[in-house]
């Protein structure tokens, strides 16, 4: 079940979220626990002329265990391993909800999460400026000013996560995206942990990114 084209949603598939409707444009990639798509949606913005609707690109992550799941039409199937699938699906849904509550300029913004097609989706900000790893390679390193700027931005994002009882356990340049204005955005919470009120960590499933994994 590893061939992404056999099991991914097709171009122009419509997904109905809680607040938005999404049209699948293309596949961005696939990891062990999900398929990430580029999609279009309408959002309302306020300006001098009042409230207007505009079309934006978003990334949508679909919970899909490539070693377990299949697909009939758009519906995700799980065969005889439904127990395993539904356990992980429940975790994925809870963690998507937690991520949707985060609001920080240097953490990828989750618009909403929702259930459809026997699985869970969440829509997030699409950051298309490339990742920090690629930027470092292209520039043959960072300047001192850039190093200080990115360290501060990501440090602020991590402090915000910690204040919300979340840990990011896969911090690396490949999981830091750059907006077109060169601001850093922390993505890929696949190895994050959520702490409960008693301070006990619960290991996550693979969730929360604008990248395939």
How would you name each of these model-derived features?
Residues 25-31, 36:
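Protein kinase glycine-rich loop
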Residues 74-101:
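AlphaC helix of the eukaryotic protein kinase fold
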Residues 113:
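Activation-segment/catalytic-loop signature of the eukaryotic protein kinase fold
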Residues 117-131, 135:
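Conserved short submotifs of the Hanks-type protein kinase catalytic core
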Residues 150-151:
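Activation segment signature within eukaryotic-like protein kinase domains
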Residues 156-166:
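Protein kinase catalytic-loop region centered on the HRD/HxD motif
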Residues 203-213:
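Conserved activation segment of eukaryotic-like protein kinases, specifically the C-terminal portion
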